[in-house]
Amino acid sequence: MEYGLLLLRLVVGLLFAGHGAQKLFGWFGGGGPQGTAAFFASLGYRRPAALAVVVGLSELGGGLLLASGFLTPLASFLLVTVMLNAIATVVWPKGFLGGYEFELTLATVAVALAATGPGEISLDDAVGWADELSGILWASLVLSSAIVISVITTTLGRGTAELDEIPG
């Protein structure tokens, strides 16, 4: 089971980290901060440049935390929040198949890892936190907090974008 959790954390965590690097640095064919901010502006976010940095850091930092199994509930919270926002603002209109099933799967994996913990091959376990930072309470806290932040972000954070804030 430990190797399965390690594989799951590495694949999902590094996938998120790669997407964060796309947003922050333009690596791997990403748009960088300017392209990401322009995309967020097209979705109606009021502070697209700031959001580009926050989302990029959430994906990069959360992905690396998840991959290493360190502060797993925090990693899960960051990643679930990003996925719920993506579902609500980008892929929901496309429906389940060909729409939001990928983002929902990633969010579910992150919540599940908050519940199970990162496993014995993790930094949380190495420092003795794995048992304290896992369980249904942590998974519930991750999911409920991510829902609250996502609702706030998608409702109060959208309106007329400050286009002059987009870098470049």
Q: Language model features by range: what are they?
A:
Residues 18-19, 40, 63:
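Generic signal for short, ordered secondary-structure residues
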Residues 57-66, 82-86:
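Hydrophobic, membrane-inserted alpha-helices
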